[in-house]
């Protein structure tokens, strides 16, 4: 029996079509009982998931149909003057508040959505 080198194998694979390579991979998975699927990162991903976000940014995505009501809601939530609130609403998407806790972000989102705005929490 003659020995086949790695270079000969690589040359043989390079000559195959994509469909033939897919069939080769399937046959190798079957023969060796393995999977060619990517292995997901284990412990590092678990550590990142354990850290819960504590500060959120409330972003006005759009003011929807009722711009006046949204401007009033923005004024009430941010303490801005009428002109500043109007400019902020018209420049959507815009950050309304940064670094707020989850409860405050959810409350602000709810009040703005009731006024007709589209809001995101990031």
Swiss-Prot record:
<keyword id="KW-0687">Ribonucleoprotein</keyword>
<comment type="similarity">
    <text>Belongs to the bacterial ribosomal protein bL12 family.</text>
</comment>
<dbReference type="GO" id="GO:0003735">
    <property type="term" value="F:structural constituent of ribosome"/>
</dbReference>
<dbReference type="GO" id="GO:0006412">
    <property type="term" value="P:translation"/>
</dbReference>
<protein>
    <recommendedName>
        <fullName>Large ribosomal subunit protein bL12</fullName>
    </recommendedName>
</protein>
<comment type="subunit">
    <text>Homodimer. Part of the ribosomal stalk of the 50S ribosomal subunit. Forms a multimeric L10(L12)X complex, where L10 forms an elongated spine to which 2 to 4 L12 dimers bind in a sequential fashion. Binds GTP-bound translation factors.</text>
</comment>
<dbReference type="InterPro" id="IPR000206">
    <property type="entry name" value="Ribosomal_bL12"/>
</dbReference>
<dbReference type="InterPro" id="IPR008932">
    <property type="entry name" value="Ribosomal_bL12_oligo"/>
</dbReference>
<dbReference type="Pfam" id="PF16320">
    <property type="entry name" value="Ribosomal_L12_N"/>
</dbReference>
<dbReference type="GO" id="GO:0022625">
    <property type="term" value="C:cytosolic large ribosomal subunit"/>
</dbReference>
<dbReference type="Pfam" id="PF00542">
    <property type="entry name" value="Ribosomal_L12"/>
</dbReference>
<comment type="function">
    <text>Forms part of the ribosomal stalk which helps the ribosome interact with GTP-bound translation factors. Is thus essential for accurate translation.</text>
</comment>
<keyword id="KW-0689">Ribosomal protein</keyword>
<dbReference type="GO" id="GO:0003729">
    <property type="term" value="F:mRNA binding"/>
</dbReference>
<dbReference type="InterPro" id="IPR014719">
    <property type="entry name" value="Ribosomal_bL12_C/ClpS-like"/>
</dbReference>
<dbReference type="InterPro" id="IPR013823">
    <property type="entry name" value="Ribosomal_bL12_C"/>
</dbReference>
<dbReference type="InterPro" id="IPR036235">
    <property type="entry name" value="Ribosomal_bL12_oligo_N_sf"/>
</dbReference>
């Amino acid at each position: 029996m003659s020995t086949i080198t790695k270079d000969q194998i690589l040359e043989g694979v390079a000559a195959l079509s994509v469909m033939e390579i897919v069939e080769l991979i399937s046959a190798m998975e079957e023969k060796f009982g393995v999977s060619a699927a990517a292995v997901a990162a284990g412990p590092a991903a678990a550590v990142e998931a354990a850290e819960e976000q504590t500060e959120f940014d409330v972003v006005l995505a759009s003011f929807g149909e009722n711009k006046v009501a949204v401007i009033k809601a923005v004024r009430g939530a941010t303490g801005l003057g009428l002109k500043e609130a109007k400019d902020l609403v018209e420049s959507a998407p815009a950050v309304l508040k940064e670094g707020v806790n989850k409860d405050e972000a959810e409350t602000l989102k709810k009040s703005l959505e009731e006024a007709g705005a589209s809001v995101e929490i990031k």
